[in-house]
Amino acid sequence: MRVETHSPSFTNPNPAEACSGDPTEMGSRLSGVSRAPLPHAAAGRDGEAAAAGKIGAFLRKAVAAQSYGLMFANGKLFEATGDALEKREQYGFSALKRLDGLSRRNLDAVAARLGALDSAEQALKQHIMAGAWHFRHQSNAALDDGEKATIASNHLLSRQARSSGGNTFADDKALLSNHDFVFFGVEFSGRDKNDKPLNHKHSTMDFGANAYVVSDALPACRNGYLTLTDHFFNRVPGGREAEHQDFVGRFAQMGRESGRWIHEGKYRQNAPLFCYRDMKAAVALHLIEFMRNSQDEAFKAYVFDQATQSGPALDRVLNSVFQAEFHIPRLMATTDYAKHPLRPMLLKEAVDSVNLPALSDLVSNRGDAVTAMWHAINKGKDEVVAYLLGNWQFEAKDFSHAPAGFYHELNYALSESGASVYILDQFLSRGWAAVNAPFEHVNRGDTMLDNAVKYGNREMVAALIKHGADRNLLSKWHKSDLDALLA
């Protein structure tokens, strides 16, 4: 699951051109669009404010075009389905037109399968389309300052050499290349954003202790896209996998039926995409299709009789039949949000997400600080180590044995694949690790220099040699590798 910049309000909430526009090149100037909320425009404002709002809307579309261009031009799935764009340095509004075309095609496909709707189905569709939705981003990271929430895409964080942890992996990038979007779960209840979310998981995953909630009317959402499932896995968790077992348990047949792939075409990972204009109609029609195919008469009666009368009841239905995921391009920076603690944060989570305010609350003694330091070593979190070094006093004996739950001794952890050279240097400089001490467990007898050579880490090799690493202690098969690495 799973960056927000915001645009002006529109008189027509679903303009025909919401997903498209004239091809326009913005060039490298777009790289400067980052974390400032863009101005809103509303009826009754003076001409200057309205003009600023139009500029903000244009910039949001221009940035969104880059996110969609990156996805459609680089995702292997879109190449396989014939929907890929040509790779370019910068993308015009044709990238948004591609989304618009896919969305319309996917909506037409489900509408064609259904044919004419009866009166009850029509009423259900209208009820869903008239509903107010909210989008929920869960995270352990510190994404707000109490006044403004700023959530960046994986792609933007990488470009800025920043990371607070994430859930985007190489397979996601290769198949979909959708890592320039911010991911949200969907709250369908229509309750206010200040009300605690009804859902705390997405596709069985708990993505964090805090939820940042925004309205679907937020201008930045107008350039987003919706999938009915997790976009990558594209499967609804049904039955015992579902989050709300109390609800699914009432409709056992529905629970069994809901665990499924939702796709168009022959590729089951080809999750149908829907732009902002089409997303509510898509959810309504796919729900009707599910109900027509369902054998659970009690569930169908519940939907028509109760879910149309209660927002929370409708949310239970839609978050059981689907696991909808909304995606906002690149960045969301807004003051119009609500933050909800869903559960206590774990120390490991605060370290992994580099949430220093939470870490400060969770570390109350040196024992906590030592445990946090081990987590930071394992994850290569330089900023956390710097924070701990600046706020706590440590001794070498604090790290002589790994705490419960950690699998490697200190020297191995400091030099394994992906380890931080900054953290290694800090420990060696303070005498908390012996540069030539042999490993006692994994690869017994090897030293940190063996690990650095094995993983081809020239920077780490240089740091170890600076601190007196003895190349004569290298395993025989690593000596020639060291020469090649330093050549």
UniProtKB/Swiss-Prot annotation:
GO terms for molecular function: ADP-riboxanase activity; toxin activity. It is found in: Secreted; Host cytoplasm. It catalyses: L-arginyl-[protein] + NAD(+) = ADP-riboxanated L-argininyl-[protein] + nicotinamide + NH4(+) + H(+). Gene3D superfamilies: Ankyrin repeat-containing domain. It comes from Chromobacterium sp. (strain ATCC 53434 / SC 14030). ANK repeats lie at residues 368-398, 444-473. Keywords: ANK repeat, Host cytoplasm, Lyase, NAD, Repeat, Secreted, Toxin, Virulence. Belongs to the OspC family. Its EC number is 4.3.99.-. ADP-riboxanase effector that inhibits host cell pyroptosis. Acts by mediating arginine ADP-riboxanation of host CASP4/CASP11, blocking CASP4/CASP11 autoprocessing. This prevents CASP4 activation and ability to recognize and cleave GSDMD, thereby inhibiting LPS-induced pyroptosis. ADP-riboxanation takes place in two steps: OspC3 first catalyzes ADP-ribosylation of target Arg, and then initiates a deamination to remove one N-omega group. Residues 1-41 are annotated as: Disordered. NAD(+) binds at H137, Q138, S139, S164, N167, T168. This is Arginine ADP-riboxanase OspC3. The record marks H137, F183, F207, D230 as: Important for catalytic activity. It is an enzyme of class 4 (lyase). Changing E187A: In EH/AA mutant; abolished arginine ADP-riboxanation of host CASP4/CASP11. PROSITE patterns: ANK_REP_REGION (PS50297), ANK_REPEAT (PS50088). The active site is at E325. SMART domains: ANK. One of its GO terms (cellular component) is extracellular region. Residues 1-14 have a biased composition (Polar residues). Its main location: secreted.
